[in-house]
Amino acid sequence: LSKLLQLLVSSSANFRNVVRQTWEARPCSRDEPWHLVVYGDEVVPGNVLRLDNKRKFFAVYVTVKEFGPAFLKHEQLWFPIAIIRSCVAKNRIPGNLYGCMRLLFRKWFLTDRIDHDGVLLDLGIPDSRYVNVYFKLGNVVADGDAYRAIWSAKGASGTLPCLLCKNIVSQETLPLLSTLFLPIR
């Protein structure tokens, strides 16, 4: 991601201007980073009803929330970060798609440390020229099936439909849970 952003800023004057306008409107710091928006969805070229469609793949795109709605509506500002063939993820990668996403997030936040060290970009700003842009994970946009695959969660069919929510339990188990150890609100 770091090298892609540096390449785009150095080779595209339009992208450099978008990043520069965003920086001038809302400069970021390690304490107030910009938010990455990650979008993922499965793409099925050809016959979607075919059972053994080996051409099916999962596409991962990323953008920056701070670009704002005026820019985010343009597909040119959603950058393809990964194209993962579904049959490869399923058969060769531990954890399937979740394992792939884990590798991406680890690369960005643990290896490249885009949240702590930032990404050095040449925006051509007078007197400073280079800026250090920091990022944190802001949103993950996906449909139900992609959500399930990205987070290795059961999604709507499970007892934990949202990663930030508490488990869903039946009314019959509430008295038992409250007497054991869980405070029920």
Whereabouts are the PLM-identified features?
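Charged (Asp/Glu and Lys/Arg) segments that form or flank catalytic channels of large polymer-
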Residues: L1-V38, F105, I114-R185
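A short catalytic or substrate-binding loop motif that flags glycine-/basic-rich loops and adjacent residues
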Residues: S29-R30, D52-K54
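Residues in well-ordered beta-strands of folded domains
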Residues: Y39, Y61-K65, P80-I84, K136-V140, ...
